[in-house]
From Swiss-Prot:
It is a multi-pass membrane protein. Keywords: Antibiotic resistance, Cell membrane, Membrane, Transmembrane, Transmembrane helix, Transport. The chain crosses the membrane at residues 11-31, 46-66, 78-98, 106-126, 142-162, 164-184, 213-233, 253-273, 297-317, 346-366, 368-388. Its main location: membrane. It comes from Bacillus subtilis (strain 168). Belongs to the major facilitator superfamily. TCR/Tet family. It is found in: Cell membrane. GO terms for cellular component: plasma membrane. GO terms for molecular function: xenobiotic transmembrane transporter activity. Energy-dependent efflux pump responsible for decreased drug accumulation in multi-drug-resistant cells. Probably uses a transmembrane proton gradient as the energy source. Causes the efflux of a variety of toxic substances, including such structurally diverse compounds as ethidium bromide, rhodamine and acridine dyes, tetraphenylphosphonium, puromycin, chloramphenicol, doxorubicin, and fluoroquinolone antibiotics. NCBIfam families: 2_A_01_02. Gene3D superfamilies: MFS general substrate transporter like domains (1.20.1250.20). This is Multidrug resistance protein 2.
Amino acid sequence: MKKSINEQKTIFIILLSNIFVAFLGIGLIIPVMPSFMKIMHLSGSTMGYLVAAFAISQLITSPFAGRWVDRFGRKKMIILGLLIFSLSELIFGLGTHVSIFYFSRILGGVSAAFIMPAVTAYVADITTLKERSKAMGYVSAAISTGFIIGPGAGGFIAGFGIRMPFFFASAIALIAAVTSVFILKESLSIEERHQLSSHTKESNFIKDLKRSIHPVYFIAFIIVFVMAFGLSAYETVFSLFSDHKFGFTPKDIAAIITISSIVAVVIQVLLFGKLVNKLGEKRMIQLCLITGAILAFVSTVMSGFLTVLLVTCFIFLAFDLLRPALTAHLSNMAGNQQGFVAGMNSTYTSLGNIFGPALGGILFDLNIHYPFLFAGFVMIVGLGLTMVWKEKKNDAAALN
C-alpha cells in the first residue's frame, strides 16, 4: 500500500529539490540574456535559437529517456541528469564563443529530458490517485520556485561577474546529485522494472509518436505543445523586451520575475488542489489558457514598472496552475505507462520550446510586440482545442 505524502517527506523534499535545481539553472540565464546579447553582438533571433537548441536536444532525448526511466529506474536517471546539468552550466560559464553556448544548451536539454520524466514517474509511483494532483502541484511549485530563485540569484550574483551564476548552478546540481545517491531509493523493484521494460523494449520514437496521437492522449499532448509554445515565446523575449522598451537593468528584470514567481507559487500551493477539486482539470486548463491569452495581448500596451509587474504576476500564475493540471490529467490516464506518458509529455513540451523561442526571436527582430501577439493567438488555439476534448477515463488502460 502506498504511503501518504506526509509519511514520505524526505523523499519528496529530495525529489522537489532536484527539479528545483534543474529549473534554477534555466531561470539564472533570464536576467543576464540582454547583457550576453550585447557582449556577444547577437540578434534576437540568435538568442531564440540558443533557447531552441536546448529544446531540440530535449526533444531528441525524451523518447529514449522515457523508456530508460522504466527500464533502468527513476533514481539512476535523476542522478545522471543532474550530473549532465552540472557539466552544461560549467561549460556555459567558461564559454567565450556562441558555439560553446550552443553546446552547453544541448547538454542542458539532455539533462532536462532525463530529470523531468524520472521525477514525474517517481512521484506517480509513490502517490495514490487521490493525492497525485496535489503531489504534481508540489512538483510544479518546485519548478516555479526555481524560476523565483533563479532570476533573483542571477541578477544578484551577476554583480560579482556575469558568468558567476552558471558556476553556482553547476555546484548545486553536483551537490543535488551526490545527495540523491545516498538518500533516494528506487521507487520500483527489479521485478516491476522488468515488467515495465517488457512493454517498452521494442518501442521507438516513431512508434511512441504514433501511440501519442491516440484520442485518449492526443488533445492533451497538443495542449502541452501549445502551452510550451506560447509560454516559451513569451519568456524568451521578455527580458529583451524589457531591456529594449523600458531600459530595465538585469536587477529590474530579476525583481519582476522573482516577485511574479513568488506570488504565483504561493497561490498555487495554497489553492491549486482546491481549485482542481472544484473546477476539474479541464476547466482549470481552459481558465488558464484564456487568462494567459488576454494578458499576452495586454503586454503589448503596458507601460511602467508596476504595470509590467502586475501583468507578469498573473501570466505566471496562469501557467503555474496550467502545468500541474495537465500533468495530473496525463498521469491519471497513464496507468502502468507512466514512463511513456512522462516522456511524451516532455517530447511535446520540447516541440513547443523549439518553435516558440525560434519564432519569438524572429518576430522580435521584426517588431518587439509581435511575439506577445503571437503567443496570445496560440493560446486561443489551445483553448479552442479544449472545447472538443472528450475525456475518456478507461481507454488508456486498454492501450497498456
